[in-house]
């Protein structure tokens, strides 16, 4: 969760850093820049909620973190490399204090050296027949692996990795053939007029085709890797330091911060088109209706991008072979400025298109609602909230609380009986937004408590005296509901304002972060990136932290990820759980939660689909924990055959229909007639909602709330 500081708080936070930051001159090169970043990160970390001593023990944790990030599967560095690097194991604290790059440069130089060697090795592997009849195994669990002792072992490891990928590709082809045959047989059985031609390849043909595809994939992977600048890895190095403090304290490069801000605010200044990469070339992806690319009527999905002229006084930049994120940053820019694209159309013709950049909304960031018509004729409102977004730079920009309010008002006009607010997979967002959203459902009162590192506790209150919805309310959560989502679910529980349904507990992130932008205090135009720093913990108004434990559902429903290791409690260096005194609050709401729970448990115990879902989840988790797999073609295909036999019993899950009826709002219905992309997105959304067994139970539960 991100906290937006007031101007005063920002000044108080940064004053101790100013004297140090201002002493730097403009960097002459990347080494100077990285040195400055290291010093600033080190000083900023002292303001962490729970600062750690920068000593040898810290250095060892950083060391382990770094290699866990840079070579997690142990298929790049040799054991001799690791022995050489180990000399620095207890020196990384000193390097941070001095801004010394010796260890970073040594490891990254060696990484690029090994990648060059491995690239040549893989080319040699593909130049010879690949034998899939040998009785070998590939280790899937990285913790069971050792770094290769020498280059022969490195070669053998990559050969096994290639075999594993070829076998997977063969299985993918086989599964596609089987699906096509099944579809064809269904057409014949039902005497339909459709004709389905199934092209069947022999096993040898599949092997040859799979080998070529994996060869191309690996070759392209190395080409992309080599295009990355060595400084691009510096964020990984810095985060090895920061994440020892806690998992949510992270260094953001300027590019990473730009992407974060774009997603958080739900907007971007650009042309309104996705850029996609295929075989080293960049192509136009889907266009946003109403955005510059779409309005030009000169650009189509699938056009190949050859050049970009980012500014009128700049030359055209050839983007063939360029990384997607680099091309995207050429195309993006300031509002109302010109960008020129040179495109190759599908017919081979070359076209130059001039566009004026505009603010383009990323609609997937925003709340959306729909009316659900239940089998008994009652109507309920469903609001999907993907994030607690906010535009901190623009006071008139979109934010989650205003969007949710607008959706509630639209639903109220439909005379709905209750509201389901879905924050499954919502990872959080702005602290202010969750407080304001709670104010849509309750009168003036505390929503959440925050405590800083000194122990000072603040209570954040909703100031609204006029909630706009006082009817039945249900919150849907999952294992991925985190931070602000947990504040909302916790407050709804504490006030007994509504029911929380979903995964037995949420993610368990109970910390608050803010951004320190280093370049704001530097006498240079260079951008040094930002540090996202944990500065507070938050607590429910009952005094309990959500850290590690999350929020328990009133109506627990297990799902596909219930048995997986998902949540803050599985993260290294996560801050501990604790609690503080209860805030002074009262509630006029009352729910018979035990009755609702008993009724739900009876329904779920007799729901064959729900029980089958639990069996599927346990089986999938068992697969995920497999540590090795055979690389012999016959054994591999037999294993896949057995798995598919087991999967057959789960096919009912894909055919499930909750029998709920969904009605779009009239403005959205009208939009589907003009906007093909929006129509397809809406149809897909409704299709997925109809397959949602949790939503069906949510309707059952909210129907019983009196």
Where do the language-model regions lie?
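Extended, small/polar residue-biased N-terminal targeting/export presequences
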Residues: 54-60, 67-142, 222-277, 338-340, ...
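Acidic/histidine-rich, surface-exposed loop or edge segments in extracytoplasmic proteins
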Residues: 37-49, 87-91, 216-220, 386-389, ...
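PDZ/PDZ-like domain segments forming the peptide/carboxylate-binding groove
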Residues: 68-69, 104, 109-120, 130-175, ...
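Conserved functional hotspot residues or short segments at active or partner-binding sites
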Residues: 125, 140, 144, 156, ...
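Bacterial N-terminal signal peptides that target proteins for export
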Residues: 2-12
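Polar, glycine-rich mid-to-C-terminal structural blocks
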Residues: 484, 496, 501-566
